């Protein structure tokens, strides 16, 4: 009987091999067509369709490689397994004779006779084929099945074969299922032994291990894998049979015919057998997991734990294993708290169960096999010079699998890494040994001569060595990827730690800045409390006038004759020959010095502190003004580049500025500033912005000339009498006409003196009124200015000698401002005279400050000057070539 089954098994393997070869050739031909299509689509530019074909090619390659290897080695593995089973049975019989206790853990497969006589799916395969031949709606006569067909538990030996044709048609399926039953898939004996191995943990604790038993356990695990595969094949065949029966039933129903009872019963039989096979598959998978756990404990466990390795793990034993892990609770408490993201990226340090370890191990092994297949396919495609896009896709898949392996390995504690790699290497060695055994027992190997066998063995050993090297390289690469990821995680943690420290340091820095900010206003007060007198820049209203922030209280320049405190400075740098010195001597001939006037400590402190604050404000304002001037210059330069064509036209149309245009020009300067050429041109309406720029440059040049002339006249006429503040100062004429200095008519003394009972607020109000009057007089028409100039020429200068004795001595003086007014009014002719010559030559020479006003830049202190309303209210007149070189300060008259 045994010889019959062996002869029967040789038939389907050849047919399966031929079928596999045909399917492989068909796949290869299909891949060639796919590659050709990909090239055509790429030439046409249809990249989306190319990607679809590439995915299809990739899936075909992945399916083709394992199919070819599996079909080539299937027959050899079956023969080797049969011989190994016989050897194992003999070894078990010898062990049973030596010791009364049997090794229940090893799943002894049934004998060949049991597998032949056991109920197997061959019956329903035969019946299924018979039904496929006879059961169809076109042939309503259904052949009655024999009792063996209705009874699935009938042995194969008792199944009658009615005709030779049916036996011939079902030979292949019968033989394939015989090979599956020989592995103990559906055998009741093998299932009973599996249940005994699961349900008898008390007997397993008595078993003593030996090297032969460890080999048997590894062999049994391999056998369990083969049994699982056979069971899966059986389930697949049962599902196919069910689908065929369903199609037959649907055909009957579609033709409104009654379904035969035999077909319905056969459907129920297939369904029940499918459920039974699925249950067997679950039992075999659980048995395989236990066997792998036992094998792992044999390789890893210490001698103290070997007595408990054969038992299935209970929850208590799992808890005991968790307590035996090297990591103690104290070590976990010593670790720093981490965020959930860091915990997800960092390797797990907590103990894991055996089931979790086995799952991770299976994942890594399966991904290693996929990586190996992909590398083989890459080598084949490279040798055949396939499409580089396909190669790139395979390489990307390998990289993704390696990263997935590293991520899976991170979930294991570090002490498990070496154990996992050793277990993987041991599994590879067992598979290679089994493969070598199968090859040596094959008929092809037996036919070879001893010399050929030696060469063949060397080739196999070389292949095995190469596989071992590849596995080690994969493991080393995996550890390198894991280490690189750990370094990246450490760097991220360090950066997060630094950011956390910086975040903690920010409140301290803010607190320090707040303290420094609080200490900064105290420093000027400490400087003011010292005995140093304030400098001229501190209390000089000149810089404040430029910034437009001058006020009587900030400057401390109020004075009166009713005992109010006055603040002065020691002007040690002023010489009697300087214009300021001469003005001081002439305004107060009885006074020898103006300096060293004592003041109270409170007023000195406030003046010094306010002076420093004003100085800081001046600097900030000057910086802002410079930036604004630069921006304005840039904007104007861009506009000038665009309007170069208009300049040529403006040269031809240039004419003298009339008095009305000049008055409008002055009003526009007062409103918009001297730098806003476009606004001034819109206001004047008869000139464009280029002509306005030329007029501004000419106007500023004339102002400088007039200033130089006034400085020279002040030095040459020391006998001039200073006018009282508040008198009209209007004059018309050119600088050439002002050879002798023109003096201003002083008002009668009764109008200038104020009663001593006036308060400082009343004095300030009167000064403001005078300033407004001066501002209104400054804007009078030109004919009124001419009349005042004629009256001013008829004035007798000898009457001024009586006035200084009646006036109170002012602490500071200013030169007469009539020349300044003459300079302003005389600029009209000079501007008109120089318009034609300086139309476009002086367009970029204007250094005027638009924020400080017209007369501030030129150092001419007229009441009502644009941009200096605060100075007008105070009544301070300033004169000098430059602000910082030669200033002169005068307080308002009484």
Curated annotation (Swiss-Prot):
Q: What is its main location?
A: nucleus
SUPFAM superfamilies on file: Homeodomain-like
Localization terms from the record: Nucleus
Where is the sequence biased in composition, kind Basic and acidic residues? 611-640, 649-659
Taxonomic superkingdom:
Eukaryota
Checking Pfam families in the record gives:
Myb_DNA-binding
- Extract the PROSITE patterns matched here: HTH_MYB
Name of protein: Myb-like protein K
Protein species of origin? Dictyostelium discoideum (Social amoeba)
